[in-house]
Amino acid sequence: MLIWLVELSEYFKFLNLFRYITFRTGAALFTSALIVFLFGPTIINSLRIRQGKGQPIRADGPQTHFKKAGTPTMGGLMILAGIVGASLLWADLSNVYVVATLLVTLGFGAIGFYDDYLKVTKQSHMGFSGKARLGIEFVIAGIAVYFMMRTALASGVAGSTFGSSIAFPFFKDFMINIGIMFVVFGGFVIVGAGNAVNLTDGLDGLAIVPVMIAAASFGVIAYLAGNVVFANYLQINFVPGTGELAVVLGAVIGAGLGFLWFNAPPAAIFMGDTGSLALGGTIGTVAVATKHEIVMAIIGGLFVMETLSVIIQVGFFKMTGRRVFLMAPIHHHFEKKGWTESQVVIRFWIIAVGLAMLGLSTLKLR
């Protein structure tokens, strides 16, 4: 919104700063963190009073988790406030990619909020119906992908099929056009990302730091993909307008830092599905917008690993009646093996950093 003040730069030279994505990204990060820091304590106290027993703890989980009973959930409300507030201030709201990303952020956040609400009120892990939840997520993601696809097609930068094509890392010009099915593909990426982060969010600080790492990585990718000079130099797809998504991701990082202040062990609040679905959906949307969906599987490899562990566990158990892991998602398996919570969290952070570096290296490998 503040970018519109650039029109007054003829009279106030300092307003020229608002032209620069890098400046607004830093400002969004700071603003978002400040919002969470300022309103976090009030939100936490309010949720603690309203929820009473807080988030239900799994009876079959590690014994160390029972001491977390009574910790409030829905901390994603703090994150959403930071992201949306900072984005409204610093991002270009006439940009379709920004609007589509915020649509997913808020839409997935609302789904997660309803799921958290049901879990808290019932004191059960059985929240929103899985099929209904996925169905609504696909509708929201599909709408966002459709409008982003149309915007990319209208740009005409790389031909009439660019918006509906899948790009592949390591190859300069290799793309596969799948037409309108790109809406389904993009929706799958976004929904998958949202639920992958949701599965990862099981320990204090475990999900939020890898999310910030992924956000920083995709902030770089969005900035480069939206700049014709950098895109041509690196031989990646130039997608006009996606540079503005770096501002939104700056807000994600700021909100993440603010939330981590309160989520650091012992956590004063959990982000819940409200936060995890929204954050994952946001990252997934940026990946689709920038044509780096496959690279997201590398940068977000930790989330992929967590998701695969659940799929393998459930599938193998249905076929054989036996389990591959002591408990899924896989971070609980390592807890059962005797790792402390801090060991699991920090080691998974290290993995996330390594995967992000590997993912970013694909930008130069053409």
From Swiss-Prot:
Belongs to the glycosyltransferase 4 family. MraY subfamily. Its main location: membrane. It is a multi-pass membrane protein. Pathway: Cell wall biogenesis; peptidoglycan biosynthesis. The chain crosses the membrane at residues 27-47, 71-91, 93-113, 134-154, 174-194, 205-225, 245-265, 268-288, 294-314, 343-363. GO terms for biological process: cell division; cell wall organization; peptidoglycan biosynthetic process; regulation of cell shape. Catalyzes the initial step of the lipid cycle reactions in the biosynthesis of the cell wall peptidoglycan: transfers peptidoglycan precursor phospho-MurNAc-pentapeptide from UDP-MurNAc-pentapeptide onto the lipid carrier undecaprenyl phosphate, yielding undecaprenyl-pyrophosphoryl-MurNAc-pentapeptide, known as lipid I. CDD domains: GT_MraY. The gene is mraY. It catalyses: UDP-N-acetyl-alpha-D-muramoyl-L-alanyl-gamma-D-glutamyl-meso-2,6-diaminopimeloyl-D-alanyl-D-alanine + di-trans,octa-cis-undecaprenyl phosphate = di-trans,octa-cis-undecaprenyl diphospho-N-acetyl-alpha-D-muramoyl-L-alanyl-D-glutamyl-meso-2,6-diaminopimeloyl-D-alanyl-D-alanine + UMP. One of its GO terms (molecular function) is metal ion binding. One of its GO terms (cellular component) is plasma membrane. Its cofactor is Mg(2+). Keywords: Cell cycle, Cell division, Cell inner membrane, Cell membrane, Cell shape, Cell wall biogenesis/degradation, Magnesium, Membrane, Metal-binding, Peptidoglycan synthesis, Transferase, Transmembrane, Transmembrane helix. It is found in: Cell inner membrane. Its EC number is 2.7.8.13. It holds the Pfam family Glycos_transf_4. PANTHER family: PHOSPHO-N-ACETYLMURAMOYL-PENTAPEPTIDE-TRANSFERASE (PTHR22926), PHOSPHO-N-ACETYLMURAMOYL-PENTAPEPTIDE-TRANSFERASE HOMOLOG (PTHR22926:SF5). This is Phospho-N-acetylmuramoyl-pentapeptide-transferase.
